[in-house]
C-alpha cells in the first residue's frame, strides 16, 4: 500500500497477427472493448490482459512444463537484470516457492486472453521451440464450459492445460515494457507488464460479453484514426504503444525486432501528470521535466502556465499532451535506447482539432 492507492500487479499482451487482406499494413493488433460497467477504463479499447492471480505463480505448473522446460527459467533464457522499482513502490516479499515473475506474468496474460477473448495461446507439451511467429490453438470441444470454470477459479486454467496436454506458450510472449497507473486516474492502480506476441494468422475471437463486449483488429494507423474519429477510446499508454508499433511495416519486422532484443531492456514507466492552466501533459522518463521521486506516486505536478508555453520551453522531451479526451499528441526528442524504439512525434492538425 502506498498512500491511498492500492497497487495491483497485472499483465497485458499486445497480440499482433498477420493480415492477408489487401492493405499497406502487414499486421493488426487485437483491441478489446471493455464493458461500460467496468470500474477501470469503462468502454475503453484495450489489449487483452488482467490482474495477476496467485494461481499464475503456483509451483504446480512445474509438473506441467516438465520434462522439456524446468525451473528456474523454463526455457526463457538468462534472467535479465531488473529495472530498479519506482521509489516508494513495493509489492512485498515474494513467495520463494512461486514461479519467477517472468513466467507467472506470461501465464497471467495468456489466461486473461483466454477468459476475455476465447483465444488459447498454448503449445503442445512436446512441441519444439519455434523460430517464427506462433499460432493460437484451435478451440477444443467444451471450450465454453472450461472458460466459465477458469473465470470462476483461475486455478482451473492449469487443469485445462493438463486436459489438452499443452502448456501456456510463454516463449511466444516477448518483453515489451510496462506502465504504472498515474496518480489521479483511479484509486485502483496497476503495475502492468506489457508483452508482445506475434501470430501468423488472426485467431477466432469470442468476447466474454461480461468484461468485454466487442473487439477489433486494427493496424496502428487504423487505431489512431478510429480514436480521432471517436469510434474507439484509448488510454494514453495504449495510444503511445500503438504509435510506437507504427515503426514496423510488417509482422516479420516486428517479430525479428522482438526476438533480437536483449532481455535486459524491459522498462516500466510511471507517467507524472503535469496539470497546466488549460490542459495536462503526461511526462515520461527521459523528459527534462520528469522527476523520479516517491512524492509523485500520490500527487501531480501543476503550473499556472498554458500547455503551449510549456511546450515552447522544452528541449528534451518524452511526453503525451492531452488536448481533449480524443486528441493526444506525442513529442519525443530522445534517441532510441536499450535497443527499443520510441514513437515518432505525433501532432494533430489544429484545423482538425477544432472539428473534434
UniProtKB/Swiss-Prot annotation:
GO cellular component, one term: mitochondrion
Keywords linked to the UniProt accession: Hydrolase, Magnesium, Manganese, Metal-binding, Peroxisome
Motif Nudix box per record, residues: 97-118
Primary site of residence: other
SUPFAM superfamilies given in the database record: Nudix (SSF55811)
A GO biological process held by the record: butyryl-CoA catabolic process
Gene3D superfamilies cross-referenced by the UniProt entry: Nucleoside Triphosphate Pyrophosphohydrolase (3.90.79.10)
Disulfide bonds: none
Family note: Belongs to the Nudix hydrolase family.
Protein name: Acyl-coenzyme A diphosphatase NUDT19
Native organism taxonomy: Eukaryota, Metazoa, Chordata, Craniata, Vertebrata
